[in-house]
Structures are given as C-alpha cells and as structure tokens.
Amino acid sequence: MADHYDENYEEVVSLPGVDTDGERTENIDDGRIRRPAEFFVRTTGDDIDEQEHARREYFNKVVGEAENEAIQEKGGLDVGAESSLLYRIWSRVNHESEEAVAGIVEKKVEYVELFFDLIFVYSLRTINALFHAYEHSFPPMSAIQTFLFLTAVVMQVWMFTTMFFNRYGRKALRDYISIFINMYLLYYMASGSNHHWLDHYIRYHGAWALIMLNLAYRSWDKLRFSTHIDDIDRKILGANVMHHLIECGIILVSIPVHETTGLVLSPLALIYGYAAKAAEHRAYKARPCDFPHLAERNLLLVILTFGEMIIGIASFFETGKNVLLNIISFLIVIGMFLSYGFFNDNVLDHHKKTSGLGFLAIHVIMILAINSTTIALELLARPLVPLFPKTMWMAAMLFVYYICLLGFERYAKEHLRANRFRFFGYILSALIIYFGLMLLAGHNQTVGALITLALVYSIFGVILHLHHSSLRKMKVGGYIS
C-alpha cells in the first residue's frame, strides 16, 4: 500500500512516554529507548492488558518503519527532527488500512447511523414549530411543558438506539432494517408533535410503543442468536428487553386510559425509561462503551442541532432588522459552537473507559438546551413578544448549556484535569455574574445581547487559557497555532 505524507502536516497527539509537546518525559526507564529520536513505548506491565499490548506492539512496529524511512531519506536523524517524526508516525498510524491493524481498529460511525440521525433533526424542527404561532406574546407554560416533553421523548429514542448500536450494532441486514423501521415510525411521532398533540394521542403513542417494541426485539435477537457475548452482555441485553417491554406496556395502557378519562400517563413511561437505564449503570460500567464511536455520534448530532440554530437566527437578517443584533446573534452561535468543538477536539479523552451513560445523559440535556436557545433566539427576533421573559429564557438555557460543558470535564484527558477546579470556578463565576447582569439589564435588548456575547467569548477564552496553561504551549488542533 502506497503511503502519502504531507511534510507540513502537524497534529497534536498524546502518546505513552511522550509529553504533549513532543518531548520525551524525564522519568522514563525503558531500555528500548536508545536515542532521543526514538519513540518506542512499553509493551508489558501491570497496567497493560492483552489488547493494549497488541496496540503498543503495532505502534512500535510503525515507529521502526517510519524512523528507517526518515533515515534513508536524509541519511540520518538528528534530535531536531524528533517532533516532525512524531507527527509522521502518528499520521501513519491513523491512515493505515483496516486490514493492517485488524483487531485494534476503532469502530467507525456507519453511514446508516448518520442517515438515521437526520430524522431527529426533522423531529426537533417540528417540535420547534410549536412556537411559530407566538408573534405577539410569550409562549404559555403549557406550550413550554409540551416542548420539553416531546423533546425528551425523541432524545430518549435516540439515546437508547445509540447505546445499543454502540455495543452491539454490526453491518447486518437486521440492524439496518431495525433502524429504517424506527425512522419510519418517527415520522408518525413528528407529525403529531404540535400544539394539538393530544388530538393525535393514539397515532403518536402507537408509534412510540412500536419503537420500544422494536428496540426490545433487537436486544432479544442479539441475546438469542449472537455467539460473541458473555455473561455481562447477557445481563445488559436481558435488562434491555425487560425495560423496553415495560415502557412499551405503559405507553399502550396510557392510550385507553386517555381515551376514557383524559388522563395522560405517558410521562410515566418516559420517566421509567430514563430511570431504568440509569439503574443498569453497574452492568454498563463492567462492559465499557466504544467511546470514540460514542463521542463521534454525539458530536454529529450536536453539529446538526447547531445547524438548526443557524436556521433559527435567519429572521435577524430580514430587511429592516437591526444589523448590530444580527451580527451579535451570529457571533453568539459561533462562540457556543467553538466552545463545544474545541472541548471535543482537544480536551475530551476519546479513549476513555466508561459506561457512556453519563456522557449520553449530558448530551441529551445539552441538545435540549441548544434547541431551547434556538427558540429563544427566534423569539428575540420578534419585536412584539415581551422582551424580559424571552431574554431570561435565553440566559437560563445558556446557563444549562455551559453547565453541561462543565460536566464533560470528567471525560477530559488526565493531564488536562489538573486545572479542573479553576475551570469550574471561572465558568461558574462567569455564569452567576451573567445571570445577575441579565436580571438587571434584560429589559434592554442591545445591552442584554452584548452581555451574552461577552459571556460566550469569555468562557471560550477561559477554556483556551486553561488548555494553554496545561500544555505550556498554544497548539490547539487548528483553532490557534
């Protein structure tokens, strides 16, 4: 296989036995390191299991090949070439074929999974349409409660599907059929996600129940026919079958109850689903998720949700609208996205061993906050809607968004967690000050917008500063170099 390298390509990496700036760590006692330019790593030790041993053996093989190539090209390798060699090695590891690293290649997000996520973009858009009718007044609490409930239901379906396919999804026809069936049923749910959703109770809840039944079947099918599962997998899959069937049963029972009494019991099903999944934490912890795959799935849905926010601020750009406000709204969206993107690219430990439950739960809340911020921005572009309540909604959702970002700290790279208490202190202080200022200045839209802009970029600046102080070098994956 031909190798293609870009001599100017650089990438920040974290390798065992090597500092984040490419220098060798001072306290390394490894007989394999014979010259400063070599980057061999330990392959044995109490902290290295069989899988990690295979990874490190393969890495050392690539190190030797890359170093030999460099020596042949230049007739020798000096200490000054150490950093470029490091990037070259890592680039080669990342671009090797799947066959060359069989058994140690991370699971990639399938195109079918990306296709599946598009139905959630449509679902969130139809739910957001709940607020299109409020051109002259702030939405009542009943509309906000409906919005929160419908969004939580859609995100639960996404969460359960993502968790299953992260651990047990394969390039199998049955998996693809299951995804397409759920996509079809989500259309029925989305079409009933409006002010009159109770008028579509049977349609909406019938589709929801069938989705739970489909998820239960996939877990049962994997439990019954898979030959590559152990006792932990059986426990997880068995619990999935039971909990999905119970939630399905609650949803189905709620239909005749609503038809005869008018009572809405389906929120109990929603609460049960989330609580049951949280109760499985120990089993999921014993069988860690494929975190790189999970992080990528979450990143893609966050990007799609921010795409809805970009569409949401379009009304600020209509003829006759305040140019300053459309500039500020655009910069706010960019700043929020950059904070998440930078954190995902540079701070998040993509090889974390974790159950994934907490990571997904934080993202469910974050996507709800992003979607709610989109609604707030749309309302802020409507001059006849009372200013103070929509301003405070915006402030509250930003507060939730950045609290979620703080929650990701537990999934950060270990060498970046040293500053976590400063990180918490700075951002919490900024949020409290921001909320207080918005209570005082929320009656003036321009002042409130400027305060919000200052918050968004001050937090982004804090993240950059703490990352810089942790690495002692401003090298942040293309954002700043």
Where is each model-derived feature located?
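PEST-like, low-complexity acidic/proline-rich intrinsically disordered segments
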Residues: 1-13
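Membrane-interface helix-loop junction between the first two transmembrane segments
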Residues: 109, 128-139, 161
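Structured surface patches comprising rigid loops and adjacent beta-strands/short helices at the edges
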Residues: 443-447
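Predominantly late transmembrane helices and immediately cytosolic-facing juxtamembrane segments
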Residues: 12, 16-125, 146-168, 172-199, ...
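Intrinsically disordered, low-complexity coil segments
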Residues: 134-142, 228-231
